[in-house]
């Protein structure tokens, strides 16, 4: 069974379609796993493998991103452990998806970015007003998720509504965005190398 799912590029229809197909396969495997549990003595039961979502994305569409959030939440509610790893860039909607991981890793060269939703809506005034109300509602939901999963403050989130909030690796650790990391400084020893 595949335990690593890649989210690379713009979060749009094709990327989400692939993600849903891959996670459909995982959900099917999980159902088979649960069926087999009834026939195995508890002491011989192995845990279902953790799933890792590797993200390298500048973000994308709120609607497609929400489909990914829903699927991750569905898997977690069923008892599947879902972790996330960021590689290089994790911006906008990808940042929100990343925060859904129970264990959140990132490479040292990774940067994160949060900002308010944007739109290229054109059309009738009422349609534009409805779109703004929708985006404000989604931003409120995303802000609540960020506040729940990190040490970021509401003040900082409000500032991100005015401009992009760029976050480097070290700051991401301090803010609890990355919650699993190797502290290289603590691992360094003063002993001489044997060669």
Describe each region flagged by the PLM:
Residues 1-195:
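Terminal-region recognition feature
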């Amino acid at each position: 069974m595949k335990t690593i799912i890649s989210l690379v590029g713009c979060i749009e229809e094709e990327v989400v379609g692939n993600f849903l197909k891959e996670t459909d396969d995982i959900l099917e495997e999980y159902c088979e796993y649960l069926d087999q549990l009834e026939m195995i003595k508890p002491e011989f039961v192995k845990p279902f493998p953790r799933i890792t979502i590797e993200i390298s994305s500048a973000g994308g569409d709120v609607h497609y991103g929400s489909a990914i959030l829903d699927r991750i939440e569905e898997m977690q509610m069923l008892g599947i452990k879902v972790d996330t790893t960021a590689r290089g860039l994790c911006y906008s909607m990808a940042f929100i998806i990343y925060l859904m991981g129970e264990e959140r890793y990132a490479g040292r060269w990774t940067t994160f970015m949060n900002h308010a939703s944007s739109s290229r809506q054109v059309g009738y005034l009422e349609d534009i007003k409805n779109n703004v109300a929708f985006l404000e509602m989604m931003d409120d939901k995303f802000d609540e998720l960020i506040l729940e999963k990190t040490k970021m403050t509401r003040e900082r989130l409000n500032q991100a509504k005015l401009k992009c909030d760029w976050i480097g690796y070290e700051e991401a650790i301090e803010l609890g965005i990355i919650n699993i990391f190797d502290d290289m400084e603590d691992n360094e020893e003063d002993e001489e190398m044997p060669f």
